[in-house]
């Protein structure tokens, strides 16, 4: 009797277990399952919207009493790589070209270039363009803007794919100083009317120069300046700044970081617009007072860079002079001015 009851109990347990297993399989495979947000630890994340504070633009630097940075601070063969305001100083060996190519190439950037070829300076257009096609921003979209008083003199240099050239007529002036002083105005107006829709970055270069080695995306930045080849190893008291207090380009003996060349500057197109417009307004203020700065637009450029620090600085390998021997501190020359008769060109 006892054994019969035990057998019945075991049978009932087995039947109940089988029924529960079948029921679980049915529920798992046939009944719809829904997940609700409140089972998650942070259900509010689905409706969360971030409200960022508006970006605050950097303000002009007022305090300028600090030691001058020296490009050859360590030893004659080693260049400084960082400014006191943490802007990189670009030179050979400070960047990986292949890595930068992988970073910037997918962005499909368009880089603009402005040059001015007025009067006899039209003779330099061909050598400039041919060297640029060989070395400047290879593999990127490039738009050359040639400002000239003689569009017929612009040669038909073959351009690579995705590389364009626009010849833009401008008025010639009897004095080369006037042409130089009008450059900032012309560039800022061109950006406002056209270039801001066509390019991402804009470099403003001199036409009487040639590229000698690759110039690539290592030069891209918000606002870019190049150190002048004649003053990279001298104290700032010897820089040819405008020293007259009556000029808006005035720089005191205790001010200045590097002396920058007017032949090379650039950056994001919006920043270049602000920069050239600011320089133009300062030039107009001087002109209203009957003043012309010592080195014209270059004096205003240097004054502006003291108060509005460049985000990237190019070493003299990006702005050299063919009349100077290459120093041991520069491993190569990328962009250099040609040896020429200045007095003949400006006559």
UniProtKB/Swiss-Prot annotation:
Source species of the chain: Homo sapiens
InterPro entries assigned: Glyco_trans_6 (IPR005076), Nucleotide-diphossugar_trans (IPR029044)
Family under the similarity heading: Belongs to the glycosyltransferase 6 family.
Gene Ontology biological process terms, A to Z: carbohydrate metabolic process; glycolipid biosynthetic process; lipid glycosylation; protein glycosylation
UniProt keyword annotation of Transferase present: yes
Notes on the domains: The conserved DXD motif is involved in cofactor binding. The manganese ion interacts with the beta-phosphate group of UDP and may also have a role in catalysis.
Protein name listed in UniProt: Globoside alpha-1,3-N-acetylgalactosaminyltransferase 1
Tissue specificity note: Widely expressed. Expressed at higher level in placenta, ovary and peripheral blood leukocyte, whereas it is weakly expressed in liver, thymus, and testis. Expressed in bone marrow erythroid cells.
